[in-house]
C-alpha cells in the first residue's frame, strides 16, 4: 500500500501538469494575439478552467502532506527557493487572469498580458526544472540534508527538462486556443503554424533528455523508455490532429508533461528524495505516514478523489468550449 499512495501522489501531480499545460501555453501566447478581441477570446478559453485544474495541485499538496509528511517537509526545505519562485509565478499568473478585466485601459490590459505570459513561462519552466532536479538527484548540504544548489538548477539536464515543459505547454496551448477560435481566422492559422513548428522540436527534446539521462542518472534505461514514450505520444498527437480530432490530440500531446513526474518514480523507485551522494536521501519507508493515518485516508480521501474526478469531467464538458460560446 505504501507504493500505491506514493504513486497516487505522483499521479495527481501528473494530472495537474497535463491539464495546466493548456493554461501555461495559452498564457504564454496571449501577447501575440494582434487584437483585443483575440486576446479576450484566448483568456476565455482558460477562465474558469484554470481554477478547476488547480484543484489537482491542491489535492497533490494535501495528499503529499497526509501520506508523506516527512517528505513534504524535506522537499520544501531542499527546494525552498525554486518553490518560492514557482509560488510567486502562480500568484502573478492568477492575478493577471483576474485583474486584466478589472479596468478598461489598453495599457492596463497590455501590462497584465505581459505579466500573464512571463508568469506562465516561469511556471512551466519552474515545474520542469524542479522535476529535472529530482530525477537527477539533489546535492547534500553541510547539515547532511538534501539541498538544491545553483549547480543543480543550472545543470544541462535540469535546463533540458525545463525546456521540455515549456515547449510541451506551448504546443498544448496553441492546440487548445486554436480549437476555440473562428475557422479561418488569422490567429487560428498562426497557432496552427506554431503547432507544426513545435511538433518536431517536441519530438527531439525527449530524445535529448534520454541521451543526457544516460550520464546524468543511474537509471539510463528508465529514462530512455519514459522519454521515448513521451516522443511517441507527441507523434501520435500530430497524426491524430491531422484527422481533426483535437481532443484526442490534446490528450496524447500531454505525454511530455506527464513524463516529467513519471521520470522521478521511474529513476528513483522508492527513494522519495534522492541525492547524488546518497547522504540525505529519503526512502519511502522513512517518509510514509503511519498505518492508522493511511487507513483513515483510504476511507475518506479515495472516495473524495473519485468525486473530484467526476466533477472535473462535468466542468470540462460545460466550460471547455467557453471561448467559442462567448
At which residue positions do the language-model features occur?
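N-terminal signal-anchor module of multipass membrane proteins
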Residues: 1-52, 58-62
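Membrane-interface helix-loop-helix modules in multi-pass inner-membrane proteins
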Residues: 49-120, 216
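Transmembrane alpha-helical segments in integral membrane proteins
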Residues: 166-180, 305-321
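Short, membrane-exposed interhelical loops at transmembrane-helix boundaries
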Residues: 274-296
Amino acid at each position: 500500500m505504501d507504493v500505491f499512495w506514493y504513486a497516487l501522489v505522483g499521479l495527481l501531480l501528473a494530472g495537474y501538469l497535463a491539464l495546466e499545460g493548456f493554461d501555461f501555453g495559452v498564457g504564454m501566447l496571449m501577447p501575440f494575439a494582434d487584437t483585443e478581441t483575440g486576446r479576450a477570446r484566448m483568456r476565455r478559453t482558460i477562465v474558469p478552467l484554470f481554477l478547476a485544474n488547480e484543484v489537482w495541485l491542491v489535492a497533490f499538496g494535501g495528499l503529499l502532506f497526509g501520506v508523506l509528511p516527512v517528505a513534504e517537509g524535506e522537499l520544501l526545505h531542499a527546494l525552498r527557493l525554486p518553490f518560492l519562485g514557482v509560488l510567486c509565478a502562480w500568484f502573478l499568473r492568477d492575478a493577471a487572469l483576474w485583474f486584466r478585466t478589472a479596468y478598461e485601459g489598453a495599457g492596463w490590459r497590455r501590462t497584465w498580458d505581459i505579466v500573464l505570459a512571463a508568469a506562465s513561462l516561469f511556471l512551466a519552466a519552474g515545474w520542469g526544472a524542479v522535476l529535472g532536479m529530482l530525477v537527477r538527484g539533489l546535492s547534500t548540504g553541510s547539515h547532511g540534508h538534501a539541498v538544491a544548489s545553483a549547480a543543480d538548477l543550472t545543470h544541462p539536464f535540469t535546463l533540458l527538462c525545463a525546456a521540455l515543459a515549456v515547449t510541451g505547454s506551448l504546443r498544448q496551448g496553441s492546440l487548445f486556443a486554436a480549437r476555440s477560435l473562428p475557422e479561418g481566422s488569422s490567429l487560428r492559422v498562426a497557432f496552427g503554424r506554431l503547432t507544426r513548428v513545435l511538433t518536431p522540436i517536441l519530438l527531439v527534446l525527449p530524445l535529448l533528455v534520454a541521451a543526457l539521462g544516460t550520464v546524468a542518472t543511474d537509471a539510463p534505461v528508465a529514462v530512455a523508455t519514459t522519454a521515448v514514450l513521451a516522443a511517441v505520444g507527441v507523434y501520435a498527437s500530430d497524426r491524430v490532429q491531422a484527422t481533426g480530432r483535437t481532443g484526442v490530440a490534446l490528450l496524447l500531446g500531454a505525454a511530455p508533461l506527464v513524463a516529467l513526474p513519471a521520470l522521478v518514480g521511474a529513476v528513483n523507485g522508492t527513494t522519495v528524495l534522492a541525492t547524488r551522494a546518497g547522504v540525505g536521501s529519503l526512502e519511502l519507508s522513512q517518509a510514509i505516514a503511519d498505518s492508522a493515518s493511511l487507513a483513515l485516508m483510504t476511507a475518506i480521501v479515495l472516495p473524495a478523489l473519485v468525486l473530484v474526478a467526476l466533477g472535473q469531467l462535468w466542468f470540462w464538458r460545460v466550460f471547455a468550449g467557453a471561448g467559442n460560446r462567448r
